[in-house]
Amino acid sequence: MKLLIDFFPIILFFVAFKVWGIYTATAVAIVATIAQIAYLRVRHGKVEPMQWVSLGVIVLFGGATLLAHNDTFIKWKPSVLYWLMGSALLIGQLVFRKNLLRSVMGAQLQLPDNAWRTLNWSWAAFFAVMGALNLVIAYRFDTDTWVNFKLFGGMGLMLVFVIGQAIYMSRFMQEDKGEAAAATPDALPPPGVQQDKQP
């Protein structure tokens, strides 16, 4: 259900584009994102900071697209959002000495410090590349190709990257399990058999 809510605006944007075109799709994306935030606020009582940022970006660039009747603005929106997320990770690490990924996922994942740093840098680099790739597609191909990439290409690359990150993290989880097993005391003797007592 959460995954559906997360992709709700982009799916509606894609459908609206195929039926009515880029400008109607942009308006639909704005309304859908506002509805998404309202639902999260009412249902869960909390909206993540990046979701507020996403709302601000779609309203700003989507609104500019509709007012200027120029789809260049909406095509820049994904790149700006990617770069904002990447910048947040870098600023947190370099300026505030705080790993934002660890702050978000540290309760669910037990990883060494070097693994968290690698993940943080990897995600920042991924967001930088995705932002640049979005503009390459936007300026070198037609709008229909860009919209298809936005839904299928972007999601596909994200999925591949997440799988790669999961494989990387699994190495450390296996090491933790091995260390825990090595630290486990020897099994108790069968019933009726006493262990030798030290004098």
From Swiss-Prot:
Plays a role in cell envelope biogenesis, maintenance of cell envelope integrity and membrane homeostasis. Residues 180-199 are annotated as: Disordered. The gene is yciB. Belongs to the YciB family. The chain crosses the membrane at residues 3-23, 47-67, 76-96, 119-139, 149-169. It is a multi-pass membrane protein. InterPro entries: YciB. GO terms for cellular component: plasma membrane. Keywords: Cell inner membrane, Cell membrane, Membrane, Transmembrane, Transmembrane helix. It comes from the Bacteria. This is Inner membrane-spanning protein YciB. Its main location: membrane. The keyword Cell cycle does not apply. It comes from Delftia acidovorans (strain DSM 14801 / SPH-1). PANTHER family: INNER MEMBRANE-SPANNING PROTEIN YCIB, INTRACELLULAR SEPTATION PROTEIN A-RELATED. It is found in: Cell inner membrane.
